[in-house]
Amino acid sequence: MNRRNFIHTSGALIGAGMLTNPLDAFSFTQKKTWTVGEIMDAFIAQVPNAPFAQTVDTIKVGSRDTVVTGVVTTMFTTMQIIHKAIELKANLIIPHEPTFFSGQDDTDYLQNDPVFRAKYDLMEKHGITLWRNHDYVHRMKDDGVRVGVVGDLGWEEYYTPGSRILNI
């Protein structure tokens, strides 16, 4: 193997290792297992003035006590995302937007809705916990969604951390 292939392969392996447990970046010692609640608490601890008394960032399916086998983050919890989580053996889905049609994810009126039932029942059947993360990620010191969009668009040179305005 030449040096270029070695560096490329090593970088891919290291990157894959970092993706395996993103919470390793938050500590010097690795923890063997994490519960949904511990992941939530670790995230919320980074947000100024959190936790919030009123927020949509609650568990919609599952339990804080679930031991996490993998995490899928997404903008929207579609059936495709739920199936991908099952395929990856990930039992925590963290969406940004509502899963069940309303901003508050109120589901009382949806109990007989076939789309609601399909999503909810599939997650429940596979032991998936769904924790919505909308308010907390927007209220981080640097809005997490903004930082993600800036990175995806390659606009880092136009962005000043903490600023809401990009100078393009």
Feature names for model-found ranges:
Residues 2-168:
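Hydrophobic structural segments
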